[in-house]
């Protein structure tokens, strides 16, 4: 698994129209966030901070059991760090999902949760936790249908109210399942 370094640098690539993370040794990671959702600080070069490294490690630990390849786990963890640090505040879009739990459910950052609707069930990681809602990111490789014409892709973020979420429990090292 890729280990964080204090030599890593965030920068915005105008030609690619994307936030990038220079990992050194001619390796560059392209963040999966569109230009329009980035805070102003994303457009200035800055170091991968101690907080970034801590968040990266936390996300890596929480996704270790997911049935993803190591490169996909790194991609997911780095996109989570980028969203946590550089994504503009967003309003919840809970109407896409069914209510699954009482209003008292409060997921933790890094927790993998389940969201359901009439079209299926998706698995998401909590990127940033707020009082009643959280920004989460799709961890499934397959697209998740929000409605018949709108789909989410791997690593795409969305903010959802906590009552739409259900906790996940590891069944074994290769699979995960909903509990509740």
Swiss-Prot record:
Principal cellular location given in the protein's record: cytoplasm
Pfam families, A to Z: ZapC_C (PF07126), ZapC_N (PF21083)
GO biological process, one term: division septum assembly
Keywords, comma-separated and alphabetical: Cell cycle, Cell division, Cytoplasm, Septation
Cellular compartment(s): Cytoplasm
GO CC entries: cytoplasm
Family: Belongs to the ZapC family.
Subunit structure and binding partners: Interacts directly with FtsZ.
Physiological role: Contributes to the efficiency of the cell division process by stabilizing the polymeric form of the cell division protein FtsZ. Acts by promoting interactions between FtsZ protofilaments and suppressing the GTPase activity of FtsZ.
Protein name, UniProt field: Cell division protein ZapC
Organism: Aliivibrio fischeri (strain ATCC 700601 / ES114)
Gene designation per UniProt: zapC
